[in-house]
């Protein structure tokens, strides 16, 4: 993935498409989250999965510049990308580490904070010199990773018996984004507090406690503990419509998120077709009037969902242009008959705003029956990311 700074943005004239990342919008989002954090709780920026499609390397630089003191990722490989940019910043690795003994050369980093579920993983990691910090994952109702119930007691006992030091304890909410009634999340919070109390009974008294992701940070201030993990909303996207409605119900109607990503391309070819012409693979679309067709060099390889074929729009000169025919691997066709000024070289907005019109990740998710997380993370790493404003 190319990471292009704002000083090189003129190079976008040569790209098939490019991503623009708004530094100002990122700063606004961070300020909004910092304003609602409980005292003594800190913010960790989650940059896993190529920073939710935004580009892990440019996002790392922007977050550090914005005063972020801790970054979270999924994998060792992601952590190493960040470590190449900053040699000291603490990095929370949340994905399960496989065969850690084979990665001793890179995991021997005291500023790696590694989340683990299995005692054997902790034993191996704690033997490294220097050893990474270890954060025990608690399954409070997600049913995925972590210890719970009698297994948790056994895990804590085993860790204590072999003298393993813990740096933190964490959990993850299962359904905060999906509901307006949050009894299950409150139950999870109670279970997490019980796990913290149990850990203290084994002598683990000064752990960094963290549970909240984006939605729960907005909705559950009592669960901020020592640290929150902000992912999707760092990038200005709501976790769900239910999250936004739930926040409104709490009386907080002023919390704002600003999407930081725009995805743009250019028209590379114009064709004129008479009525009753077929467009694209499979001849699935037939014109019903003389049609001006614009070709955009973006397709499903670049991350544009094929389900948007004849089912979506892009923006050209501030107007919506309908996608016609099947989206190709590297090209998409638009009906620009109603946009007289559309020509080769005209900028096309795939995600973002152009004049009074906008197309959001949520718009694309609604059209393709998925979530904004998937829309963003599908965007190809090969597309250059350019920092603007």
Curated annotation (Swiss-Prot):
Pfam family, one: Ala_racemase_C
The enzyme's E.C. designation: 5.1.1.1
PROSITE patterns linked to this entry: ALANINE_RACEMASE
SUPFAM superfamilies reported in the protein's UniProt record: Alanine racemase C-terminal domain-like, PLP-binding barrel
Gene that this polypeptide is encoded by: alr
NCBIfam families: alr
Residues noted as binding substrate in the record, renumbered to the chain: 144, 329
GO cellular component annotations of the record: cytosol
Its job: Catalyzes the interconversion of L-alanine and D-alanine. May also act on other amino acids.
Modified residues (N6-(pyridoxal phosphate)lysine): 48
Catalysed transformations (reactions): L-alanine = D-alanine
GO biological process, one term: D-alanine biosynthetic process
CDD domains: PLPDE_III_AR
Presence of keyword Nucleotide-binding: no
Cited SMART domains: Ala_racemase_C
Protein name, entry field: Alanine racemase
Protein's pathway: Amino-acid biosynthesis; D-alanine biosynthesis; D-alanine from L-alanine: step 1/1
UniProt keyword Cytoplasm, yes or no: no
């Amino acid at each position: 993935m190319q990471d292009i700074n704002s000083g090189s943005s003129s190079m976008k004239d040569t790209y098939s498409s490019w991503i623009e990342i708004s530094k100002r919008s990122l700063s606004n989002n961070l300020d909004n989250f910092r304003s609602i954090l409980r005292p003594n709780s800190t913010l960790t920026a989650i940059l896993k999965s190529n920073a939710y499609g935004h580009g892990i390397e440019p996002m790392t630089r922007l977050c550090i510049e914005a005063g972020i003191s801790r970054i979270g990722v999924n994998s060792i490989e992601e952590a190493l990308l960040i470590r190449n940019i900053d040699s000291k910043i603490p990095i929370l690795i949340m994905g399960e580490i496989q065969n850690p003994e084979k990665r001793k050369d890179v995991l021997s980093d005291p500023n790696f904070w590694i989340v683990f579920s299995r005692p054997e993983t902790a034993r191996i990691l704690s033997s490294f010199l220097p050893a990474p910090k270890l954060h025990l994952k608690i399954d409070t109702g997600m049913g995925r990773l972590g210890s719970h119930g009698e297994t948790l007691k056994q895990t804590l006992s085993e860790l204590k018996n072999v003298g393993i030091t813990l740096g933190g304890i964490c959990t993850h909410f299962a359904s905060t984004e999906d509901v307006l009634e949050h009894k299950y999340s409150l139950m999870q919070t109670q279970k997490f507090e019980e796990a913290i109390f149990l850990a203290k009974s084994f002598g683990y008294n000064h752990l960094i406690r963290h549970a909240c992701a984006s939605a729960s940070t907005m909705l559950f201030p009592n669960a901020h503990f020592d640290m929150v993990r902000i992912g999707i909303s760092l990038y200005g996207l709501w976790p769900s419509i239910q999250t936004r409605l739930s926040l409104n119900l709490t009386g907080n109607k002023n919390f704002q998120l600003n999407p930081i990503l725009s995805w743009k391309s250019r028209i590379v070819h114009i064709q004129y077709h008479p009525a009753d012409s077929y467009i694209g693979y499979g001849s699935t679309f037939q014109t019903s009037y003389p049609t001006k067709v614009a070709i955009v060099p973006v397709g499903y390889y670049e991350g544009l969902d094929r389900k948007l074929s004849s089912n979506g729009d892009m923006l050209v000169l501030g107007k919506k242009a309908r996608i016609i025919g099947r989206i190709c691997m590297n090209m998409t066709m638009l009906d620009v008959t109603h946009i007289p000024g559309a020509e080769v070289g005209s900028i096309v907005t795939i995600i973002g705003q152009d004049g009074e019109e906008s197309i959001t990740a949520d718009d694309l998710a609604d059209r393709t029956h998925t979530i904004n997380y998937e829309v963003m993370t599908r965007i190809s790493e090969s597309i250059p990311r350019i920092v603007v404003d």
